[in-house]
Amino acid sequence: MNRTLLSASVAEQGALRHTPAGLPALDVWLEHDSQLEEAGQMRRVRARLRAVAIGPVAERLASQPLGAQWRFEGFLAGSGAQASRVVFHIQDFQQD
């Protein structure tokens, strides 16, 4: 299974573009900051993650303000020929 849920804000956003198939696409950088329990101890977790939205989700996300908190749902995939670089593919998002 490859399903990811992440609370994050959009820190950076590229221009809305189109894939070779003609679908809208939006490249973004997400920032996450939380406190979680790990091995019985509280741990602060910060992460910055490359992400992409395709289709109607890309159009919706492009119209949202930078810095707003969202709950993102999607999957992780390698970035083209460089499979060691992970990109979060956003399939849906809602207000966190």
Residue ranges and their predicted role:
Residues 1-96:
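Single-stranded nucleic acid-binding surfaces, predominantly the OB-fold ssDNA-binding core
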